[in-house]
Each structure stands twice: as structure tokens, then as C-alpha cells.
Amino acid sequence: MNPEEQRQLRELLRTGRWAAIATARDNEPLASWVAVAAEDDLSGFLLHLSHLALHTRYLEVNPRISLSWSAPDGPDQPDPQQLARVSLQGRVSAISRDAAGYAVARTLYLHRLPQAAQQFELGDFELYRFVPETGRFVPGFGRVHRIGPDDLGALSGPEK
């Protein structure tokens, strides 16, 4: 991956607060959208999900999910297949309110998504942490890079 592609990937993951989520239960796939906050070292991604949402019920049965981000499309982009995009696969787990890291995770999530503060007062929402295991980064049409936790960790350092 060249430095420009590393910059694109870092930006997608650090600033992207809206991601597609793919879940599956009983051989029934489901894709939806969720708000997401990247941890500073990109080792995990925080989701604050309602138990009323179908995707939450799916991931409670099968914690293997995929999250995907894309650079924004727009009128100045003649071909959306040229947009940078990333898809990460891994596992998600709930963060108990009495867990040692809950307060830190909540603070980070609200720093990235301050409008979500009122949702933390609702009883049907729970904080989850997604840990990526594998992924694919496509910086543009016809170019693809397989990525893993070590690649994400390398991105969390200072830009080169």
C-alpha cells in the first residue's frame, strides 16, 4: 500500500461515523447502517445499538459481522467504482455497563458522536466493541489490499 492509499484508509476509518453493517442469522443475511466510532489505535470500533433493531438481534445470535465504509459519492465523482472503500470482518461483543473499560468507551463514542448522548439514557441501547480480524481495502477500481489488525495498528501511528 502506498502512502496515499494509507492516508485514504486512515481517513475512512478515523473519520467515517456511518458504516454499513452485515449480519447473518439462520442463513438469513441482513445489511443495515450504524453509527460507529473508531478507537484511536484502530484496534476496535464502537457501536451503540438498540436491542429493538433487527441487526442487533442478529449479532446477538451470531457475533461475526462485517462493517464497510466508503468515501462519499457526489456530482464531482464521475464513476462511483473509483471511490475508496473498506470492509472489515470480525467479531462484536457487548461492553457491560459495569466493565472496567465501559466509561472510556462511552466517552470516546460520545466524543465522536455527541448527538448520541440521549440514547445512553434509553434502556434498550447497549454499547458494543467490534474487533476486526480481516479486511479488504479498495482505494479505487481494480486495486485491492487485504488488511488485518497489524495493518490497522500501523495506521494508528503518526502519518508519514
Predicted regions and their residues:
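An N-terminal domain-cap segment
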Residues: 1-60, 77
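Short beta-strand segments in beta-sandwich/barrel cores
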Residues: 19, 65-67, 92, 134-137
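Conserved hydrophobic/aromatic beta-strand scaffold that supports enzyme active sites
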Residues: 20, 31-35, 87-89, 127-129, ...
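Short glycine-enriched loop/turn motifs at secondary-structure junctions
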Residues: 39-42, 86, 121
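Short, structured beta-strand-loop surface elements
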Residues: 52-112, 125
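C-terminal edge-of-domain segments
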Residues: 12, 107-108, 112-160
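Surface loops and adjacent helix of pleckstrin homology
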Residues: 50, 70, 140-142
